[in-house]
Structures are given as C-alpha cells and as structure tokens.
C-alpha cells in the first residue's frame, strides 16, 4: 500500500498531519512551532525547548523522567531548534514502537502522547521560572553547542559569511543565539519566552505510523484547543534576500592551518527547482564542476561545494584553500559558474544531477523523520505535494532553463578565514 497523507486544521493556528506508511513498526509524534528569528528570543527559545524534555511537573528531575522512558520500551523524547530562512523552528518529538509490537500490547501511543503534552503544557518550574538546577545544566549544554560550532571552522566560516550576506535580516542570526545572549538568560525570562511561543506562534503537529489513530487526534484537540492563542499571525517563509549593489569582502585572520573561503551569490529567480539544479551542476555533487575541475583538475581546494538556500534565494559556495591560492580559487570557482551561464552543461552532468535528485526523493520515507521533513517543507511553501510530483518538476528542467537561472546569480559576499601569520 502507498503512503497516505492528510492534513486538517486542529485549530485556526495549529495544523495536524497524519502520514500513514504501512511498512512502519513505530509511531512518531512531533509538534513544531514557527517563530521569527530574533536576537532577543533565539537563545531563550533554544534553551527553553531543551528544558521541556529534561524534566516536567510530573517527572520533576532528569532521573525520574529517564526512568519513565525506560518503562515504556525506551521511548525516544527529544527537542530542538533549527533555522529556515528568517524563522526559528522549535519542536518536541516522541517515538516508540507501535502498540501491537509491545510485549503485552501496552498503550504506548497513549503514553507517548501524554508525555509530549505533559512536557509541552506542564513544564518544571517554580516561582515563574524554570527550576535552577536543570536551567544551569541545559544553559551549559547550549553554551557548549555554540562553542562547538565556533570550533568547527567550516561551519563557522559559513555562519560568518551568512551574517554578512544577510546583514540586518533575521537569517543572519544563529538559531542558538550568541554566547553573550545565553549568559544573560535567567530561569524567569526563559520561561516567559517559552510561554510567548506557546501562545503566539503557529504550530504544526505530525503523526507518522502505520495506522490511523482517531484517539490521538481527539486527545490533541482536547489538550490544545483551550490554550489562549487569540492573534496568531500567519507567515510567509519565502523571503528572498536582495543583492548588495557591490560585493562585500570580509577577511578574518585566525590561527588555522587552512584558509576557508565562502562565496554567497543571490538570485531573483523564484523557481526553487531550477535553482537547485544549478547547485547540483555547479557544486553539490562529486560529479559537479567545482569538485571535478577546481578541486581535482586544478588542485586549488581541499574541498569545494555549493548549496542553495531556497527561502533566501542564495547560493552558498564553501571551500578550503591554501592562503596562496585564495585568489586563484575564487577566480576558478566563478569561472565554473560562468561556464554554466554560457550553456556549458554536459549530458553526463545533467544526468548525474537528475539521478542524485531521484535518489534523494526516493529515500523519503526511509525514516519517519524524512516523512515529517518533507511535509514540513510543503508547509513552508504552502504547497502540498508528493516527492513524485517534485521529481516530475525536476525532470522537466532543461539545460536552457539551468543556464537562464544561473545568469540571475550575482556575487554578494566573500568571506575569507585567512591563516594568521605569526608575529616575528
């Protein structure tokens, strides 16, 4: 039997999607809130959602919650924040085996739903703030996450490039906030931020399992309908970033052995399918021009690849380069783009891109999370369709379409993490 999908409005501002895949032996439930990415709230939201799945009012310590999870066949309970363009997504996910596979057919779906709702609606707090011990523990974890991003130089270089490329736009921010933002948090203002999300942010709930669960829908409706959410806005998630009049170059000397260079180019083409194809031809694959030519033939980069931000309409090209090769590498990278703009696309390159897209789309459904990610993407675009529908869109794209789209790309930002010279 094929996968079936159905979405209904649980309330005016909460959607409920049921994704049924007969091959699954697990049930997965996720709730996601969508909040504008803001300096004032990013760190608060990141910390708050990590606290929600650390303990709650019913299981008021990490140990007690862990024991509860162990009694339920090791239910997976996770939370986290991510970034999509100008928005921060904040979510909680629970997953366990389907009831019929439990040793005594225990009502695990009901238990995991109750657990998610308890975490969501009954956080562990005292005097209008999260409890101090859990707060300090998760605050340190968040600081460690931010520090790890800084220490991972490739990711850091990309983040710095985007900060310049999207200057004065929410997309310039990290979904975790900055270290100083995290250090300024208190149990009180973190709980207040969570309550603001709960009462004002649009939300989507996703259930993925083998069978329809009417009980689940009724339980969610009974728990969430009473929440006071009077004026929840609806958002447009596709917010293209305008290109700068002239490219901006930022050079940051750091004590690294290998320089990093990130180029950000912006487009006014709103066809995300064809722009993704441009990226596949340019640098998203081992068969792409950047890897085959700049890295392999010219030996100018240790790595060189591209990715495309659909909500911001921005192409991001990331490379690791020796200091002495920075200018050569930049010129060579832009030459590969020029080649595409001039129609230099081989049949093999086009077929490789199509095959990669086919494999990616064909893999949707291998995990419950891939189902959710697909339909959350549909939510962002307010366009619900299947992976098969998308494949048809991609396969219809011609070399001429790719060439025309590539010509819309304009260099916006060059970020260079340069090797710091030791002082004599």
Language-model features and meaning:
Residues 1-20, 212-251, 404-424:
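Proteolytic maturation boundary segments
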Residues 45-53:
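Active-site SXXK
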Residues 112, 193, 216-219, 274, ...:
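Hydrophobic side chains in well-ordered alpha-helices
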Residues 17, 25-38, 43-44, 62-118, ...:
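M16 family metallopeptidases and their MPP-like homologs
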Residues 66, 122-146, 233-242, 335-364:
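Acidic/histidine-enriched alpha-helical segments
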Residues 17-44, 195, 202-204, 230-289:
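His/Glu-based metal-binding/catalytic segments typifying zinc-dependent metallopeptidases
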Residues 129, 187-223:
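Non-catalytic, conformational "gating/processing" segments within enzyme and secreted inhibitor domains
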Residues 55-58, 100-103, 122-131:
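Short, polar/flexible loop-turn hinges at active-site or ligand-entry regions and domain interfaces
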């Amino acid at each position: 039997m094929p996968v079936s999908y159905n979405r209904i409005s649980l309330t005016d501002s909460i959607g409920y999607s049921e994704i049924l895949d007969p091959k699954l032996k697990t049930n997965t439930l996720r709730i996601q809130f969508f909040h504008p990415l803001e300096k004032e709230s990013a760190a608060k939201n990141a910390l708050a959602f990590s606290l929600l799945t650390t303990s709650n009012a019913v299981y008021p310590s990490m140990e007690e919650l862990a024991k509860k999870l162990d009694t339920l066949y090791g239910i997976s309970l996770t939370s986290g924040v991510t970034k999509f363009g100008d928005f921060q997504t904040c979510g909680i996910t629970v997953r366990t085996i389907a009831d019929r596979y439990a040793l005594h057919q225990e009502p695990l779906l009901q238990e995991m739903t109750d657990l998610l709702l308890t975490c969501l609606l009954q956080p562990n707090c005292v005097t209008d703030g999260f409890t101090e011990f859990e707060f300090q523990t998760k605050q340190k974890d968040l600081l460690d996450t931010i520090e790890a991003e800084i220490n991972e130089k490739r990711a850091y270089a990309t983040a710095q490039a985007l900060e310049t490329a999207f200057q004065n736009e929410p997309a310039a921010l990290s979904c975790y906030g900055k270290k100083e933002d995290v250090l300024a948090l208190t149990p009180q203002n973190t709980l207040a931020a969570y309550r603001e999300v709960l009462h004002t942010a649009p939300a989507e709930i996703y259930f993925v399992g083998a069978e329809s669960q009417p009980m689940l829908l009724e339980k969610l409706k009974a728990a969430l309908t009473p929440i006071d959410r009077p004026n929840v806005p609806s958002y447009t998630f596709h917010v293209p970033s305008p290109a700068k009049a002239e490219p901006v170059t930022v050079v940051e000397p750091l004590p690294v052995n290998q320089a990093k260079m990130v180029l950000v180019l912006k487009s006014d083409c709103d066809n995300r399918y064809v722009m993704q194809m441009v990226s596949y031809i340019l640098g998203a694959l081992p068969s792409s021009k950047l890897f085959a030519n700049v890295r392999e033939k010219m030996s100018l980069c240790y790595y060189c690849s591209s990715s495309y931000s659909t909500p911001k309409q921005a192409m991001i090209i990331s490379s690791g380069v020796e200091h002495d090769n920075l200018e050569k590498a930049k010129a060579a990278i832009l030459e590969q783009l020029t080649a595409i703009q001039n129609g230099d696309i081989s049949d093999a390159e086009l077929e490789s891109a199509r095959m990669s897209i086919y494999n990616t789309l064909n893999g949707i459904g291998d995990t419950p999370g891939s189902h959710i990610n697909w339909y959350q993407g549909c939510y962002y675009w307010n366009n619900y369709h299947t992976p098969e529908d998308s494949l048809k869109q991609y396969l219809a794209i011609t070399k001429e379409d790719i060439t025309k789209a590539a010509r819309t790309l304009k260099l916006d930002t060059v970020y260079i993490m340069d090797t710091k010279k030791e002082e004599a």
